[in-house]
Amino acid sequence: MKKGIHPEYIPCKVTCVTSGKEIEVLSTKPEMRIDISSFCHPFYTGSDKIADTAGRVEKFKQRYNLK
């Protein structure tokens, strides 16, 4: 690698806003905040949330008096 052209990598504290967990990685920034991570994403946790679309449709129809 050429000297003097690559950024300096420093320890970076990455904080997941949703779960509040922190991990440390190497980056060019000292700190990052992310909305979702493998600690709280349904794919990784196995806790899928199934949307009750039928209930939502019925609620919508009731609200606007639709048949």
From Swiss-Prot:
Coiled-coil ranges per UniProt: none
A Pfam short name: Ribosomal_L31
SUPFAM superfamilies listed in its UniProt record: L28p-like
Keywords: Ribonucleoprotein, Ribosomal protein, RNA-binding, rRNA-binding
GO cellular component terms, A-Z: ribonucleoprotein complex; ribosome
InterPro entries in UniProt: Ribosomal_bL28/bL31-like_sf (IPR034704), Ribosomal_bL31 (IPR002150), Ribosomal_bL31_A (IPR027491), Ribosomal_bL31_sf (IPR042105)
Keyword Ribonucleoprotein: yes
Listed NCBIfam families: L31, PRK00019.1, PRK00528.1
UniProt xrefs under HAMAP family: Ribosomal_bL31_1
Self-association and partners: Part of the 50S ribosomal subunit.
Protein name in UniProt: Large ribosomal subunit protein bL31
Organism: Helicobacter pylori (strain G27)
Gene that encodes it: rpmE
